[in-house]
């Protein structure tokens, strides 16, 4: 089936799809203070979703394209779940968040099909994959339209990988208790086996969101990157997130000696946001298999255990947490009790001495990840490094921080 036909099949014009903001039925906190974060974007009045401009631009989206799609959503006169929130248009039609971003992705998909230059075609496919992922954001369980956008993103990503430099292999890993999970191994030019970074992404992202990390930082240093989706998302959607948050990644680590392109004696883990929860657990539970663990804006304790911190977090992010935990209609109190169990300090890990070298990067006044969480990580390691990343200028400092983290990883792998 062609990509265009797949799009037509998946996105049939129906209007009874559940609207994203209604999927998690929690009690609202009411008015919340504005939030701005380098990794998560910021809350903007009259939007349910956080607008994550930095990460979208970092992934290759033109700022003007973001504004263009937003303007189409704002101008829509279609029925909304909440008339005060622009991005709550009901049904797959003009003005609906998923519709507008998927429509934008299809423009690039058509450019990719028409382009004769393989590398440029690959760039267009990659751009389409990124836009489909934004369409599916924040990837809540039960969001039928978002899941269809994710399927298109994965197809576009596979098309891109066939045309872009280096090699990408789609891999399956066996995990007891369910179907195998799918990951992508990105390899630089040259002969393997390669030192490899196992990516542990955030809860509101897909594994295909991290190609820029591989292309700009790891590949130039001869380092491969292996990604899998976090539990309950994408290819791992049938796996519920549990307190044993690192379960999937542990099984992947244990399988690496059987992967000929990976040097299993030179592996590091890199965790963004809640992915750092996974990476730090790996540092403790799988230290013989890891040379290093790096974290960025880690969610390992405070947000999971501090009620005041949770009150500062936007509704959308709490909805993401509730969705990942399978608590779509639980009370806020029940959600708080469950989140506390995911704290690595409460679990008895953080605070104990860990032999694995660990780096943690943080931003001051980050509402999701205070400095104390990063200090807790680095002080627990026998070889810890704390990295403060200044907020402004946000893009330049984000790039500089990633360069420093990559250099630190490289020294421990190569």
Swiss-Prot record:
It comes from Escherichia fergusonii (strain ATCC 35469 / DSM 13698 / CCUG 18766 / IAM 14443 / JCM 21226 / LMG 7866 / NBRC 102419 / NCTC 12128 / CDC 0568-73). Catalyzes the hydrolysis of esters. It catalyses: a carboxylic ester + H2O = an alcohol + a carboxylate + H(+). This is Esterase FrsA. Its EC number is 3.1.1.1. Keywords: Hydrolase, Serine esterase. HAMAP family: FrsA. Belongs to the FrsA family. It holds the Pfam family FrsA-like. InterPro entries: AB_hydrolase_fold, FrsA, FrsA-like, FrsA_esterase. GO terms for molecular function: carboxylesterase activity. It comes from the Bacteria.
